[in-house]
Amino acid sequence: MYSSYSLSKCLVSFHILAIQLFIPSVASLNLTNVYLHHKCRVGQGKYHPGSRYEKDFDSLTSFVAANKFIDGFVHSSNSDGPNSTTIIFQCRGDSYKSNCRTCYDTALAGFRKRCPRNKGGIIWYDQCFLDVSMINDLAPRKINYKDTFAMHNPNNVRGDTKMFSKKTNDFLQQLIVKADKPDMDGVELLYYAAGEMRIGREKLHAMVQCAKDLADCKSCLEWSFKELSKCCDGKRGARFLGTSCNLRYELYPFLRT
């Protein structure tokens, strides 16, 4: 029997603040799903081939795969016993249904390859992340400040970097406010916002997003925004990622329209 909304809050710390990534082609970014980073939860141990844990884990991954990914988010657990496993999977806000399903397949294969037989771990791709853990917690989830990292374009903007940073930061703050507003039905918070704006001759593209089961989206995004500012002001593109929320800006389009 599978249940939703239970996740680990026992996470090992890692924090990477200046991983540089330069993507030269807009087309390749839009059409591919680039691997970004991963972390194996070695403290949760490994499972043996043919074990009960492996069977339960395979059953859970198949259960998640059967999801239609309508809103691009899944949070599911298989039990509360010693073989308990929780999967949290979320796609970028512009990736859902078939695009999201493809990213799930890619992320699961990547997790199995990079964390072979690990009972827990996290893997991030350009359009989604997959979080696997043995330790469960009930939703709404608290902010995970530990499993985060930043990436930025190695190049700085030309001209007035202070003006660029101010306008970029102001725009990101506007998106954060928008993401924390109710949807059209007034039932749930959006937890996602994207947009573009002109800065001189350049056009800025940006997005912010929270996990659907997060207790406090705005606080997570505001904290991530501050962390991004520490490493990446004046860069031509940057992002800050985690399992609770993420934000990104570029000087080229990177979202589906």
UniProtKB/Swiss-Prot annotation:
For this protein, the record's PROSITE patterns field holds: GNK2
Q: Name one Pfam family in it.
A: Stress-antifung
Q: Note the CDD domains from the entry.
A: Gnk2-like (cd23509)
Keywords per UniProt: Repeat, Secreted, Signal
Spell out the subcellular localization from the entry.
Secreted
Signal peptide range: 1-28
Gene3D superfamilies in alphabetical order: Gnk2 domain, C-X8-C-X2-C motif (3.30.430.20)
Q: Which residues form the Gnk2-homologous domain?
A: 35-137, 145-254
GO CC annotation terms, alphabetical: extracellular region
Q: Can you tell which superkingdom this protein's organism belongs to?
A: Eukaryota
Q: Which family does it belong to?
A: Belongs to the cysteine-rich repeat secretory protein family.
Q: What is this protein called?
A: Cysteine-rich repeat secretory protein 34
* Protein source organism: Arabidopsis thaliana (Mouse-ear cress)
Question: Coding gene?
Answer: CRRSP34
